[in-house]
Amino acid sequence: MDFHGNSVHQVGYGHPRVVNAIKDQLDQLPFCPRRYTNQTAIDLARKLAKLSPGRLNKMLFAPGGTNAIGMALKLARYATGRHKTISMWDSFHGASLDAISIGGESLFRKDVGPLMPGSEHIPPPRRGKCHFNCPDENHDGCIEYLKYVVEMEGDIGALIAEPMRWTTVELPPKNYWKRVRKICDENNILLIFDEIPSALGRTGKMFVCEHFDVVPDMLVIGKGLGGGIFPMAALLVHEDLDIVGDRALGHYTHEKSS
């Protein structure tokens, strides 16, 4: 067992059941064009829909987590008509240009030049050392600053965040995400959780958001979804966001055969 392994080894290295399933699939159907589907993809989608919290029963697969983040950002624009986002400083959502725009690590942003417009950032609610020196677990200073940014910008389409900071394993205050969910609902802002490295049982529950009794509008998963052998990710949303059937939200060559 590798407790790091880039967060892909929930079932260890080369688990026999995963290896055998991949071999069987290669014998049956090694590739599926993106314009079609296949029974294996359908079965996986149904399984994830059954496991997912709330109404997150619609999904689109992608060949990697960064790709799925890009799909979430595009869907948020289609759904709200707004392009602005709020995300956290020091967060990580991938290394592509759109992902580092919403990400907050200087390692990926430094000297790159102009990033995506409308990518607003706020400090994360770190326990005991947050930017606003909040005196207790309520983190009123962090919440009030979020409200301030929402009010001043006025046209935020989505808030995207890691419900649990994974690189440094930052545990958020228990009620923080409930308060964020309320702010999003009051301002018609979509809440997107990036659980690419943390979902699928790594925290004792299938999804991190279940620890906080909060269901996002979109949930992005990946890494361990590919069994530690091949890259795979998925964007899960509720059925109200199934609105772009006539457009290429993903359109990745291997989105149906990853």
Regions found by a protein language model. Give the residues of each.
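Conserved N-terminal phosphate-binding loop of PLP-dependent enzymes in the Aspartate aminotransferase
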Residues: 1-258
